[in-house]
A protein has these predicted regions:
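Acidic, surface-exposed loops and disordered segments
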Residues: 2-241
Length: 241
């Protein structure tokens, strides 16, 4: 299996695309069909969720066959329909929770895309239904991610230029440009793209979040950092503060 193929293909799962192809294909989808997730797809997602929770100390939970969270007024205002499965993105109440949720949550999102599923990050357009998830006293929910087979594949949106979000130039490495281009295709809150990547000497990269009245910039930063890693190749650089 090529290195850039997701490693979470199980016996009965045929991986449909590489992570790079998933980045190109992924668009936020808010309307879903009633097609259920197969046992193999669920098992693959749960394997990734277990890995993410162990690696980051998160408490991500996959909720299946539960439509009530997306039947509230806010969900209708957000144009969600047919949502029966979703991810509860939860973790300990720490300063870096949002960034960890973004970074590791996007790993699940791109895996889902390779499995033929569609997703959408959801900040407020849902309701928390009692007894559908479990939280410890020191944990909180950062957001939800809707999940399922889309009624459509979503649409692309206008994105910023490379120059607006990085210091890429004729003298920066190609991998840096590849990383920035991958980051530009990442989902961010209301498509705000409030981030900046700076290449510094020694193949080090600084990722910064901007200021936004909308919020969610720390979560967005985690999402775009993962996209950057996929595009650039983690072996080519190190993150710097």
């Amino acid at each position: 299996m090529p290195e850039n193929l997701t490693k979470f293909a199980l016996v009965n799962i045929q991986v449909q695309m590489t992570l790079q192809e998933a980045i190109q294909a992924r668009h936020s989808v808010r309307a879903y069909t009633d097609k259920p997730l197969s046992e193999d797809v669920v098992a693959t997602l749960k394997a990734k969720i277990n890995e993410v929770n162990a690696a980051a100390g998160l408490h991500v939970q996959l909720i299946l066959d539960e439509p009530k969270s997306f039947q509230c007024a806010m969900a209708k205002y957000g144009h969600f329909s047919g949502v029966n499965s979703y991810l509860v993105m939860a973790g300990k109440k720490t300063d870096d929770l949002d960034e960890k949720v973004g970074y590791y949550g996007e790993q699940i999102v791109l895996l889902a895309q390779t499995l033929g599923l569609n997703t959408c990050w959801v900040g407020v357009s849902y309701s928390k239904i009692p007894d559908t998830y479990v939280l410890e006293d020191d944990e909180k929910i950062a957001c939800y991610i809707s999940l399922g087979y889309g009624a459509n594949q979503g649409v692309s949106h206008k994105i910023k230029s490379v120059k607006e979000v990085s210091n890429a130039s004729d003298v920066t490495p190609k991998w840096f440009l590849d990383g920035v281009n991958a980051a530009l295709l990442a989902p961010t809150a209301v498509n705000q793209q409030k981030f900046f990547f700076e290449y510094i000497t020694g193949n080090k990269v600084i990722a910064k979040r901007g200021v936004s009245l909308v919020g969610y910039t720390q979560m967005d930063l985690g999402i775009v950092k993962y996209h950057f890693e996929v595009g650039a190749g983690k072996e080519n650089f190190e993150w710097a503060e």
